[in-house]
Every structure is written in structure tokens, then in C-alpha cells.
Amino acid sequence: MKREKVTSLNGEIHIPGDKSISHRSVMFGALAEGTTTVKNFLPGADCLSTIACFRKMGVSIEQNGSDVTIYGKGIDALCEPDSLLDVGNSGTTIRLMLGILAGRPFHSTVAGDESIAKRPMKRVTEPLKQMGAAIDGRADGGFTPLSVRGGQLKGIDYVSPVASAQIKSAVLLAGLQAEGTTTVTEPHKSRDHTERMLNAFGAELAETETSASVTGGQKLRGADIFVPGDISSAAFFLAAGAVVPGSRIVLKNVGLNPTRTGMIDVLKQMGASLEVIPSEADSAEPYGDLVIETSALKAAEIGGEIIPRLIDEIPIIALLATQAEGTTVIKDAAELKVKETNRIDTVVSELRKIGADIEPTEDGMKIHGKKTLAGGADVSSHGDHRIGMMLGVASCLTEEPIDIRDTEAIHVSYPTFFEHLDQLAKKA
């Protein structure tokens, strides 16, 4: 896809529904008793994989664009799938679903695409095995395909080596089916969509700053869920609005969950002109409008506790840093190596192709700004949606057009991304 520089970006867009919350709304609706309705669901490939997997386990789900209805009959109504549960490209689907399958008295096999086959699963399968699930696969359950025989689980106190909402959620979902209480403790607080949604579906949890506990045997009740816009998708337009000259972009109804707003903190730290207008609506997840305008940016050091709050935004932050005065350092982000691609390598290689002064480090990267991006190169998403969208924003800045390969990857989380970008763009 050939893309060229724009003179400015102006207008208002509605960001598609949050991917993390969309996944969970379907899963919890499938486990609940009664009907669950979901508004502003994200109909991207990843979330559609979640729907397909639960349909295979006998759950009746109607999906019409961004409206979804799940006719739940309780967790005990899930039935043994008669074929492979295929998660496609979705790490959230496989890791959370493993927590559910761990407590079900049947056999299932779970796998996904080539990217999923490379992603580490032991971080989830190990605590589930400790609880009593039988899980096997390549490298002793470390990689897909995975075979799961669920059964009687016992609650555990699990100390996670990394702050990961996927690990925490998998163990808590298993804990709902276990005897006794299950507690997960993390080094820093990860995103808390699971805890908020369990509350919305009627479950009781005990929480501290870095831990969450559930007691087994609780029943979930169907709920009405509004999914706010995905801040990880909004991040691309926040960055674009900050660095493309003469821009002003309004993003409507974006999720403002404090465990996800690291991008907003970084933009403010870098000196961006950003206004946050919280919604007054009563909702399990806070949300509001964001207004971003072009401004001069300065470099920042990004690391420590903020990393779990912006791990998915690091590719676009790297691009942002090319347009900031000084050297930006991103550290404590080794988790990037086990995303859809090794995002340290792919961000560095693709941004270098278009003229960025960027170098990889063991746990992040250093970006030297402010730099004019020459462009005039062939670049690729490497099958990673967030790299594809980062390059889409980069094309607005490059002196010469760039040709972006493998743009279909963006359908995972933001099928209308380029449509929205073109809607805002004033061409040179």
C-alpha cells in the first residue's frame, strides 16, 4: 500500500471498541447465566476468533457488526468441542480461554496461527497445572498446539514473575472453578479489565494494589456491557495529531482505564497539547473524549511501572520520539520480544528504513530526535497490526512516499484504520 505525506490531520473520529474488553465481554457472557448484550464490540479478527471458539463449545452468540448478544447458560453448559479451538492471531483468546478450559471436565485442543505458535504459553500453563489441570503441548506445554484436560482444581496463591493481565486473568478464571480461594500477585498492577468485568457480572473479588483474589463456585449473571473505544488504537491518532503540523483531532468515547493510560502520561511528559474530557456516564470502565493538537515535543525516559500501562503503545511512542528534541530512552520492556513479532527488532528495522536514528537495547530502544524522515522505502508490518499502523502514521510525515507491505495485519484490531486516517488527512 503506497502512502504519502499529508499537510495536516483535522476532524473527529469514533475509535472502534476496546479489544481487551470485547474479548472479555464475550467470554464472561458465555460463562454467565442469562443474556448478555454488548454494544460497540470490536468486530476485528481477534475478537471474532473468541466468538468462534465459544460457539464451538455450544454457546449461542449473535453478532451484528458491533452489537453482540450472548445467550449464556452458565459455565457448566460449555460442552466438549468436536474440533480444534482455533484462536487465529489472538494471544488474549488463547491465554484467557486456557483458564476457562482448565476447570472444564472435558478434553480440548487449542492452537492458532504461526505467530501464536512462537509465543510462550508456559507462563499461563504452569500455574494452571499447579491448580490441577492436565495441559500438554510442544516443549512440555510451552507452545501450541496445546491439549487440555480440565478437571477438579484447587485454589493457589500465585506470584507472577511479570505484570501480565493475561496471566492474571487466566488464573482468576480458573480460580472461579476451583476449590477455595485463588490469589494472583504481580510485581506491578497490570490492566484490570477482568476484575472490573467480573464485578459487572456479579462476582466478588478481593483486591489490593498488586493482587486479586477470587473464591471458587461463584455464578456469573448476564450483563449489559458498553465497550469504550480502544486507547491502544487511539494512540496512533494521538501521536499523529501531536506531530503532523497544523493538526487537531477529537477522539470520541475512548477508554480511560487508569491501568491503560500510560500513553496519555507520556504525551503530557513530552509536552503534547492534549485535553482529556471524562464522560459523566455510569460505566464499569471510565471513558471520555480526547483532543490532541500539534505541539513541539521533548524527549522522555520511559520505564518501570508505567510499562505495563503502555506496552502495546511502544511502537507508536518510538515514532513519536523521532519527532521530539533530544534522546528518548525506552527500557524495562523486554516483553516486546514476545509480542506478535519481536517488536524491539521490527520497530527499529522499519523506522531505520525511513530515516529514523534509532537503536535497539536489551530491554527497549533509544531514539534520537528531532529527525526528518526521508521515506522513499518499502516497509512491512511483518504481520503485526501495531507495526502496520505505526507505519501508516509514519507515512504522514515522510518526505517521500513509502510502500507498506502486509497491511491486512491491521484487521486484527482496527479494520477501518486507513479509512479513518484518510478521513482526517489534508494531502500535500
Curated annotation (Swiss-Prot):
Family matches, as Gene3D superfamilies: Enolpyruvate transferase domain (3.65.10.10)
Catalytic reactions of this protein: 3-phosphoshikimate + phosphoenolpyruvate = 5-O-(1-carboxyvinyl)-3-phosphoshikimate + phosphate
Binding residues annotated for 3-phosphoshikimate, in chain numbering: 19-20, 24, 164, 166, 312, 339
Pfam families xref list: EPSP_synthase
A molecular-function term among this protein's GO annotations: 3-phosphoshikimate 1-carboxyvinyltransferase activity
Catalytic residues (UniProt): 312
InterPro entries cross-referenced by the UniProt entry: Enolpyruvate_Tfrase_dom, Enolpyruvate_Tfrase_sf, EPSP_synthase, EPSP_synthase_CS, RNA3'P_cycl/enolpyr_Trfase_a/b
PROSITE patterns noted in UniProt: EPSP_SYNTHASE_1, EPSP_SYNTHASE_2
EC number(s) from the headed UniProt entry: 2.5.1.19
EC main group: transferase
GO terms classed as biological process: amino acid biosynthetic process; aromatic amino acid family biosynthetic process; chorismate biosynthetic process
Pathway as given in its UniProt record: Metabolic intermediate biosynthesis; chorismate biosynthesis; chorismate from D-erythrose 4-phosphate and phosphoenolpyruvate: step 6/7
Residues that bind phosphoenolpyruvate: 19, 91, 119, 166, 343, 386
Keywords, in A-Z order: Amino-acid biosynthesis, Aromatic amino acid biosynthesis, Cytoplasm, Transferase
A GO-annotated cellular component: cytoplasm
Location within or outside the cell: Cytoplasm
Lineage top rank: taxon: Bacteria
Assigned protein family: Belongs to the EPSP synthase family.
Oligomeric and partner information: Monomer.
Functional note: Catalyzes the transfer of the enolpyruvyl moiety of phosphoenolpyruvate (PEP) to the 5-hydroxyl of shikimate-3-phosphate (S3P) to produce enolpyruvyl shikimate-3-phosphate and inorganic phosphate.
Protein name: 3-phosphoshikimate 1-carboxyvinyltransferase
